[in-house]
Design a protein with these regions (language model features):
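RNase H-like polynucleotidyl transferase catalytic core
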Residues: 21-27, 120-125, 139-158
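Active-site beta-loop-alpha junctions of metal-dependent nucleic acid enzymes
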Residues: 87-113, 130
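Short conserved beta-strand segments at catalytic cores or DNA/RNA-binding microdomains
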Residues: 61-94, 103
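Basic, flexible linker segments flanking DNA-binding modules
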Residues: 1-51, 152
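Single conserved hydrophobic/aromatic residue that forms the stacking wall/gate
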Residues: 159-170
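Two-metal-ion RNase H-like nuclease active-site motif
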Residues: 42, 54-64
Length: 170
């Protein structure tokens, strides 16, 4: 007997063999704010490619189910080496989590004497990355600020592609 995929799913569903897929997932980006949105330094010609450690760091936030609710993992990944150079796990999406991850990344680059004046910090346009505290810290170290435009998720794919592997999920 040959049946199609949809019929197979119907049979599974009617017998309670499918997991529910409509779980609520927390939102990690709030781009609806009045902070300044920095230009996208990666969308230039010729296309920017990180070829050395300390050329670009990519920032993003993901969520983790802790069994006691959601927690938010802020990650900073060096684009060339793909090493996570900063991280912080917090229960809220406040700026403190990403700021702590940024402090860790700054310490990493300082430890290895990497000139941060040529470093590009690339992130989405989330309120955490646009906040005064976060931007001031970047400017203190002369770090160049770059943000995705029009919600282009492809620029942050560096983190999203490697996230499950780095977190021990695969």
């Amino acid at each position: 007997m040959v049946i199609g995929r949809d019929r197979c799913y119907d049979i599974f569903r009617s017998n309670g063999l499918c997991q529910r897929t409509s779980r609520k997932r927390p939102k990690t980006t709030n781009s609806n704010h009045n902070y300044y949105i920095y230009p996208d330094l990666l969308n230039v010609a010729p296309k920017f490619v990180a070829t050395r450690l300390g050329a670009m760091v990519v920032a993003d936030i993901t969520y983790v189910n802790t069994g006691q609710g959601w927690a938010y993992l802020s990650l900073l990944t060096d684009a060339s080496s793909r090493a996570i150079v900063g991280y912080a796990l917090y229960k809220t999406l406040e700026t403190e989590g990403p700021l702590k991850a940024l402090e860790m990344a700054i310490s990493f680059y300082e430890k290895y004497h990497i000139d941060m004046s040529t470093l590009i910090h690339h992130s989405d346009r989330g309120v955490q990355y646009c906040s005064n505290k976060y931007v001031e810290r970047l400017k203190e170290h002369q770090i160049n600020i770059s943000m995705t435009q029009c919600g282009d998720p492809l620029h942050l794919s560096l983190i999203h592609i490697s996230e499950p592997t780095r977190l021990g999920m695969i």
